[in-house]
Amino acid sequence: MSRRLLIILGPTAVGKTDFSVSKALEYGSPVISCDSRQIFRNMSIGTAVPSASQLAAVRHYFIQSVPVTQAYTAGDYELEAVALVERLFDEGHETLVMAGGSMFYIDAVCNGLDNLPDGDSALRAELWERLGKEGVGTLAEELRLKDPLTYSQIDTRNSQRVIRALEVCLVSGRPFSSFKTGERRKRSFEIEKIGLTRPREELYSRINQRVLNMIDEGLVEEVRSLLPYRDCQALQTVGYKEIFEYLDNKIPLEEAVRLIQRNTRHYAKKQLTWWRRDPDIRWIDL
């Protein structure tokens, strides 16, 4: 019996959800979400979770399953997602549909992550608290002193990446980079990757319109309800950081909207740059 994991990937707003639901119905599969933002609860508008009708049509996993206050890593996702995939194959599925745009989550499932030491939740909480008070630059400088190689390789403006690397350094007493082996983990199932794309101007137009739709659907109110948790890992992301700035009276709403649109377009470009290097992806123009 074949055991094929069909991974549908692509930039934000390209149309992965509709495509994945249609494929799931075709193969009698659930949709296994591979999205590092949609996995958190209480963030439905700003992360564009599947609609009620889409969720009703096909069972979805890893949608709003983790509390917004909980730190959750690509390593956590690898363990849980691979275990789920194995179980569903054992139950008789021949093809399973996974869909998402989170590069590190997809890489974790396909190739596995290096065996990092167990995290320290108390230390992680302390680092996130420091982030709120001192800013990511201070933590990045601490990482540079402990692990110059990792500092030179990651986006040091990405607070989540900086904190994860620094946590490993502090827990282990070793540089984060010393745990990187580059070895691919073998899976007991075949992996097929389909990448979705659109002409750039069309994709950017869809992104801009999606942000306007989010505002109409109540994004500001959603972010306001999350103010007590604004320093949590889950909320250090596009669509929330900008609205927090607006709620702090630092920028007008129109500027927050413009920044969300711009930052989302930048993220889409980053996603495509990352995946274009992967020769195993079969691209489909929508």
Regions found by a protein language model. Name each.
Residues 1-286:
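Phosphate/pyrophosphate-binding catalytic cores of soluble transferases and nucleic-acid-acting enzymes
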